[in-house]
Amino acid sequence: MFVSGALDAYTLLLRGGVFAAMQTGNLIYFFMNLVQGNFSLLYKYIFSIIAFCLGIFSEHFTRRCKGGTKISVAVIVVFYTVGFAIPYGDLNFVANMLFSFAVAIQLQLIRTVDSFAIANTMCTGNLRSLIECVSSFITEKGERAKYRRGIIIYSTLILAFVTGVAVVTALIHYI
């Protein structure tokens, strides 16, 4: 989660205002610019969204292969490495595509922690699940240990994500 928060802050602040993981944000920016007639900006959002979709699609098939997880992890590492190696500027959209593709694979690889469904690249679902666990902890007296564990898991994930955002934002002048 730390890496996901850091990567979204990095791409938003240094790679043209595009999110690597939060495709909801990219969809919002895409359609806002479409409605406002800013057609020259649409490519940077749509390419990231398409790359994310292709990453989800490819992981569906890769996981069925022998050694599929190793292949997926290798793709993530290679795509992150190449994405960071691309100079800032006109090719930001290519770096963002690589990051979005890799993030999609990451999202597909890690779906649960200790039987709790998680999103490892974004916070909205984890925040919802945290509040559900807090509510259930208060109302469901018989299963408090289970909900306490959920509170710890979701709080840790959210804290890691926002810490990644904070670190990149604080270091942005040095990157």
Name each model-derived stretch.
Residues M1-I175:
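Alpha-helical transmembrane segments of multi-pass membrane proteins
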